[in-house]
Amino acid sequence: MSSEFSLPHRGVVPELSLSAEMPQDAEALVVPVFQGEDGLDLPESEFFDGVTVRAALDMLGATGAAEEVTKVPASTGPIVAVGVGKRDDMDAEKLRRAAGVAARSLTGLKVVATTLGELGLAAAVEGIALGAYTYRGLKTADVPEDQQPVQKVVFLGKDQALFDAAVITAEAVAFARDLVNAPSSHLFPESYAAIATSAAEDNDLTVEV
């Protein structure tokens, strides 16, 4: 049986990269914020002025509640604060969900940096990638530029091995979504076998069908 088969349409996820420094072309910075007992709890970071950002968030009424998104205007591009809830209650799934919400708020932007990975790099990568996942299928109408999903997200950090593993996980989930979203008229038992064989060969694995 031939392993040559391609899905009629593929979903899109942003380009993901890791950097120890703020990229010069970043149009926005996404940061996490906790819901503190006495107001906002903003994690410290070397990549922004916490005092200034905290004051702006307070002025805008941000609370840090889970999945709340607040955008702070800045001369170098907006700072997008996404709430992750109370610090003691945070776990990987809550961070993943918050990252997904943040990703969906970044439409129209080309390059964005984020410090979300400082709270958990794997969950942040998976949340951003899958939150921004877009599947248009048979739709052919052009999408206005300001409604396009974010094109590239740079995670500020240094753990390349953990980042690479998270990217692989996100890509695998996105591919599974492609299979679910594909029209049933385009998929049949032989095509699933061909897809599995092709994926195995691409990763230097052997497969028997």
Show the residue positions of the predicted features.
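Glycine-/small-residue-enriched capping loops at alpha/beta junctions
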Residues: 1-209
